[in-house]
Amino acid sequence: MYQSTLKTILLASALLILPASMSAQKRKAAPKKAATEQVGKPDPNFYIFLCFGQSNMEGNARPEAQDLTSPGPRFLLMPAVDFPEKGRKMGEWCEASAPLCRPNTGLTPADWFGRTLVASLPENIKIGVIHVAIGGIDIKGFLPDSIQNYLKVAPNWMKGMLAAYDNNPYERLVTLAKKAQKDGVIKGILMHQGETNTGDPKWAGMVKQVYDNLCGDLNLKPEEVNLYAGNIVQADGKGVCIGCKKQIDELPLTLHTSQVISSDGCTNGPDRLHFDAAGYRELGCRYGEAVARHLGYEPKRPYIEMPKQIEVPADAFIAETTVPGNEFPKVDKEGRAYFRIAAPEARKVVLDICNKKYDMQRDGKGNFMAVTDPLPVGFHYYFLNINGVNFIDPSTETFFGCNRESGGIEIPEGSEGDYYRPQQGVPAGQVRSIYYYSNEQQTWRHAMVYTPAEYELAKNAKKRYPVLYLQHGMGEDETGWSKQGHMQHIMDNAIAKGEAVPMIVVMESGDIKAPFGGGNNQAGRSAYGASFYPVLLNDLIPYIDSNYRTKSDRENRAMAGLSWGGHQTFDVVLTNLDKFAWLGTFSGAIFGLDVKTAYDGVFANADEFNKKIHYMYMNWGEEDFIKSGDIVKQLRELGIKVDSNESKGTAHEWLTWRRGLNEFIPHLFKK
C-alpha cells in the first residue's frame, strides 16, 4: 500500500528490457518505485495529473529509443492496469516510461508532458500521471450515467480494451485518483478526445459533464484544476477528423476552465488520424508548457533528439528506375542517390547498396531518408532493411537479382551510354514473354524472346533469322538481360546503325536463381545449373525453331552469357560444336580450366577449333573479381582465335555486360 508522501526511489537496478515472450524467470526487474516520507499526509510537492481520452491519448506511434528511457524519479506513473512484462502493478507508483497506457500501446502526449514539467519545475517537485484511454471511445464512455448503454453498442474490437478497465474507464480513473490523492495533489486534467464525436453538437457539454464529475468525485476546486484539451491531427487541413478542430477550439466557451493545446504543425502518421512519434513529442511538450505557465513557471523544454535533415539538391532528378508517381529515389549530378520510405512504426531502417550500409534518418514526418556516397555509373541492386528484415523499396521497379526480387537504381552515364538507351527514330523490336513445355523436366518453363523491328514487316514474312541464346548470371533470371541489361535497346541501336545483323535473341532461366550450394569443388560447380543443358538442347531450341522464323543450322546459332551464364556457355557450346558456331562470355565464371585438356581437349587442335567457332569473345571489368585475362592468354598461346576486352572502370556488374554485348553482336553471323 502506497503511503502518504514520496521518499527515495527503491530498486537501484536499471530496467532490463526483455522480450515479452521470455519466461517469467527472465523478465525484467520491477520498475523503480517511490517510498514514503511522511505517513498520512499528501506531499504538496507531488503534482498529479489525470490523463484520459481515445487513441491519440492512448498512444499510437511506436516509441523510439529516446522515449523508452525513464527521465528519472521525478516523473512517476500510477499504472491503470497490470503490466507484468515491465514489472508494473496497477495502483503502484513507478518511474514513467513508454508505454504509459497499457501493454501494446504506443507513445502518448503524456510522456513528453511529464518530461517538460520535470525540466520546467523546481527539482523538489515530482510529477505523477494516471493514464486511462481507449482507442475510438466516445466521450459517453467516460460518463457514469452512459457507460452501461455504451457497452451495448461498443464495437467488438473495443471490448477487450474496455474490459481492461472492468468496463468502466471513468471509475478506474477516479479510483486510482483517490488513491493518488493520499500521496500528492491533483493539479490538472489532460484530455485528448473528440475524433469519434466529430460533428456532435453535444460534445462540449458532455466534456464539461466529465470534468464536473471528476471535480465532484475528487473534491477538486475548478479554479485550481484546469482541463487541457489537445487538438486533433491536422495534416495540413487533410486530417481525417479535421472537422473536429473547430469544436475543440470552442470548448472554452462551454467549459471556462479548459484550455486548448494547439496541434498546429504537429507531424502525423500516414493514416492522417494519429500523430507520429515526433508529433506526440511536440504535442506533449505543448501540454507541459501550458501547465507550467498556469503554475507560474517559465516553461523549459527537455532535450529532444531531432532527426538529421537530409538536404536534396534542387538539381537532383528522379531515377529512371523509380516507379512513376514517386518522388524518390533521386540522383544528383555527383552520382549520390537519395532514398525515402514511409515507415513511421519502424525502429531502424538501413539502406544496403554497393556493398555499403547507410543508417537511414527520420525526417520527423514518419519517413526515413538516406543519401549515399557518390555511386559508380550503371545499375545497382539495393535493399531496405527494416527492423532487421530486408524489404524491397516500394518506390522502385523490381529486378530479379541476388537470388530474389530486388530493388534497383540506375546511376546514369553520359552520352557514352546512348547505345543501351532507346533512341527516337530507331525502330524498336519486341521482347516477348513466352511459356513452353519442357519434356526434360515435365513442366512449363518461361523464356523471353527478342525479335528485331523488321521481323513483323509484311515484306519480311518469309525471311528467317539467326538466333543468339543469351544467358544471365547466378542469382538472376531470364528477365535480367531485358530489364537490367537493356538488351533490346542495344540490339535495336546496333541493327539500326548496320553494325549488327538482325537476329532473334532468346533468354531463359539457367536454373541458377537459387544460391550456389555445391561447395568449392569441381563437382559442385559442374552440377550447378547443369539441369538447364538438356532443356536448352532438347526443348528450347526445338521450340524456338518451330515457332519462330529461324535459321536452324549451327552456322546461325550463337550462345553467350554473363558470369555463371558464361560458365554455362562454355559447358554447352564446347560440348556441342555441331549446334553452335559463335561463343561469348562476359565476366565468365570459368575457374580451374586446363585449356589443353578441358572439354575432351577441344582446344588442342587450334585449326579445327577455329574453323568450327567463327567468333569467340570474352570481356570482364577492370575492377572485376572474375577476370578472363589469363584464360585468353593461354588460349592464344595454343593458337585459338579469341577476341577480348577489359571494360574500363567497371566491376562485376551490368555496365560491364552491356558493353560486352554491344562489342560482341557486331561480329555475329558474318563471314
Curated annotation (Swiss-Prot):
Residues 297-671 are annotated as: Feruloyl esterase. Pathway: Glycan degradation; xylan degradation. Its EC number is 3.1.1.-, 3.1.1.73. The active site is at S55, D271, H274. The keyword Signal applies. One of its GO terms (biological process) is xylan catabolic process. Optimum pH is 6.5 with glucose-pentaacetate as substrate. Active from pH 5.0 to 8.0. The keyword Ion transport does not apply. Residues 1-24 form the signal peptide. One of its GO terms (molecular function) is feruloyl esterase activity. Residues 1-296 are annotated as: Carbohydrate acetyl esterase. Keywords: Carbohydrate metabolism, Hydrolase, Multifunctional enzyme, Polysaccharide degradation, Signal, Xylan degradation. Induction: By growth on ester-enriched corn oligosaccharides. It is an enzyme of class 3 (hydrolase). Optimum temperature is 35 degrees Celsius with glucose-pentaacetate as substrate. Active from 20 to 50 degrees Celsius. Still exhibits 40 to 70% of the maximum activity after 20 hours of incubation at 50 degrees Celsius. It catalyses: feruloyl-polysaccharide + H2O = ferulate + polysaccharide. Pfam families: Esterase (PF00756), SASA (PF03629). In the N-terminal section; belongs to the carbohydrate esterase 6 family. This is Carbohydrate acetyl esterase/feruloyl esterase. It comes from Xylanibacter ruminicola (strain ATCC 19189 / DSM 19721 / CIP 105475 / JCM 8958 / 23) (Prevotella ruminicola).
